[in-house]
Regions:
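Alpha-helical transmembrane segments of multi-pass small-molecule/ion transporters
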Residues: 1-314
Length: 314
């Protein structure tokens, strides 16, 4: 377990670099990577969500009751800013339908699991970040389908009930199972959690392999446009999230947490939903995969910037 723990620490530390290398390999040499099928995406995401559940404790939800205003502000920002920004970018760049669906799905999904780590590295309010991730994830089965219907319903048929069931099965059930296992077998999970970065990164890398290798030719023709839109969506999320915190006169640690939480999305879920519910639009899976690569890079850069500014103030 010690060796595995060291490997896991290494993988967690260099996750962004690993994801970039694998994504580039799947893009330029799709053949070897195509052994990973897009049909695996839901199961792989379930593994990531189960891992998230293993790290959750009842105390993580205390912030919801002890500081409801902070959590509400963060979650409202999450589910208003990112969906609107996604839709606005699809209009500004006149994205074709299949790319637009993918971008909108990224915007309507809850906060990403790695946002908590980035908040910690940024010297932000980790309790708030964990609380926001937990609450936005619980709200996702209801809000993600409805927001997708609102912003993408004019372009394509959206089945909110079917999406609701998918999110419950792929996200809530694995998280709940992980939470229960952690509660009843805490001594075991305390050891197992050490290898979670390895397991989660492997699952995310395999999702990216599946999506990028299956669509490499199409990415080559429209990849730059997707990348520009994804970067703008992510960066605008960081900026507007931070701006909301400042506007409401929250302290800097809370502003950092909200900024990162709003900007970083559960893009694996966006990819999963695109593959399951919009299979007739293969490119809809691409924005989620590109976001998965990019937000780990931008999140690390932003966390480093926030940490340095916090040190200067101290």
């Amino acid at each position: 377990m010690k060796t595995l723990g060291k490997v896991s620490d290494f993988v967690g530390k260099y996750m962004a670099a690993i994801v970039i290398v694998v994504a580039a390999g799947a893009l330029f040499f799709p053949g070897p990577f195509s052994v990973v099928k897009t049909a695996w995406v839901n199961n792989l995401l379930g593994i990531v969500m189960f891992g998230m559940g293993l790290t959750l404790k009842p105390e993580d939800f205390k912030v919801v009751f002890s500081r409801p205003k902070d959590v509400i502000v963060g979650c409202v920002a999450q589910f208003t800013l990112m969906p609107f920004l996604a839709w606005a970018l699809t209009q500004v760049f006149h994205l074709p339908t299949e790319l637009a669906i993918g971008v909108i799905l990224v915007g309507t999904c809850p906060g990403g699991t790695s946002s908590n780590v980035m908040t910690y590295l940024s010297k932000g309010d980790v309790a708030l970040s964990v609380g926001m991730t937990a609450v936005s994830t619980v709200l996702a089965p209801l809000l993600t389908p409805l927001l997708t219907l609102l912003y993408a319903g004019q372009r394509v048929d959206v089945n909110p009930m079917s999406m609701f069931m998918s999110i419950v099965k792929v996200v809530l059930v694995p998280i709940a199972l992980g939470f229960v296992v952690n509660h009843f077998f805490h001594k075991f999970t305390e050891e197992a959690v050490r290898v979670l970065p390895l397991v989660s990164t492997t699952a995310i890398v395999l999702i990216i392999c599946a999506v990028v290798s299956a669509n490499s030719a199409k990415i080559m023709t429209s990849g730059l446009l997707i990348l520009v839109v994804v970067i703008l969506h992510n960066v605008l999320g960081y900026l507007t999230g931070f701006g909301v915190g400042k506007l409401l006169k929250l302290d800097s640690t809370k502003c950092r947490a909200i900024s990162i939480e709003v900007g970083m999305q559960n893009s694996g879920l966006a990819t999963s939903l695109a593959a399951a519910h919009f299979a007739q639009y293969p490119l809809a899976t691409i924005p989620g995969a590109v976001f998965s690569v990019w937000h780990n890079i931008s999140g690390a850069i932003l966390a480093n910037f926030f940490a340095r500014t916090a040190e200067k103030k101290d």
